[in-house]
Amino acid sequence: QYNIQGMEKEREAMLQETQGMLYGMQYEIQSMQKRITAMEEKIIPALRKTFDATFLVYQENKIQLPAVIDAWEAQTMMQMNVLDEKLKLYEMIVDYEKELYR
């Protein structure tokens, strides 16, 4: 009798722990999605505008080529960061679903 109750309590505790972990993972996924969206909708367009403006100034022979390369590099690095973040997001979603259906 006590053994069965103990096992039931242990099972309940494990379920609560798993549920808490899943809620935590859900929150992480949502916050990462928001961060990626902000990067795609705000940061990358701003870097693209900076690059375009820098390139125009370069075409007018007012700045040197390294400034244009720096602006291009900043934009490209941010695009790479977004791709890295998306990879992490997709891996997190896979882990979440594995845990959910375990």
Question: Can you annotate each of these PLM segments?
Answer:
Residues 2-81, 88-99:
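Amphipathic alpha-helical coiled-coil segments
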